[in-house]
Amino acid sequence: MLVWMPGNEKAKNYATKSYHNVKQLEGDKVELLPSAADVMRIVPEYGKELNVAGGYINWGSGWADAAAGVRFAKKLLDEQGKVVFKTGEVDRLLLADSQSATSQRRVTGVVLTDGTTLTADLVVLATGAWTGKLVDLRSRAISTGQAVAYMRISDEEQRRLENIPTVLNFANGIFIIPPRNNLLKIARHAYGYQNPKAVPIPGGNGVTMQVSLPENGVPVPLEGQEAFRTALKELLPSFAEREFVTTRVCWYTDT
């Protein structure tokens, strides 16, 4: 569900255009919520303190537990015994000496930071926010860190909120995800944080380039935590001052 706040005409206009765009694709699955009362009809669990002016909900979309999905897929692979998992950090790609008809050198494998070499007939990179280190994506994509925080909730709060839609305020990119295991997750996808690093240009004979790369284990800066508190005061006021049990910066590569 995408919502806009009172008095924010820019956010309202964006959400309205988004509604009409999605409506063309999803038809009756998309429902306009032109007033705060309409929003409350969809998420009464948020309470009367919910400070929104309107929005829309797409009943054809939803939230998926990515971690649970990966665990399930890994379990199936382990049961079949057809896939070998090797863990390590990739330092660079291995490139064929000769070029193809398209003047591009074929990737034949990877070199890990410990010097181990892995080769394959077909190399598929699913490297997410680390891709910019291995492939020159300058002017095409950039890795940014986005804020994520968790707070502990009671059993009663878990039952009350566990089936709510994901609520997104597109004016600031902050969204609240249905809680699982007594943890409420709030996150933001906006311009994000950058972590500039100098790395060798792939195939560049030692010449370096500056790209933004992930930094593991970094908590959300104070700016991000304060933004979450402000958003919670509008969406879930009773949670606004509750302690975050953990925060982290989650990295993405976007065009």
Task: Give the label of every model feature segment.
Residues 1-42:
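Dinucleotide-binding Rossmann-like beta1-alpha1 core, especially the glycine-rich loop
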Residues 4, 92-94, 176-177:
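A structural signal for short hydrophobic beta-strand segments in well-ordered beta-sheet cores
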Residues 17, 38, 72, 89-92, ...:
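Alpha-helical elements of Rossmann-like donor-binding domains used by nucleotide-donor carbohydrate transfer enzymes
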Residues 3, 109, 148-150:
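Conserved hydrophobic/aromatic beta-strand scaffold that supports enzyme active sites
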Residues 6-14, 56-75, 217-226:
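Short beta-strand to alpha-helix junction loop
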Residues 55-122, 126:
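Helical element adjacent to the flavin cofactor pocket in flavoenzyme catalytic cores
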Residues 118-125, 129-255:
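Active-site substrate-recognition segment that forms the wall
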Residues 34, 86-89, 246:
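Short loop/edge segments at beta-strand edges and connector loops
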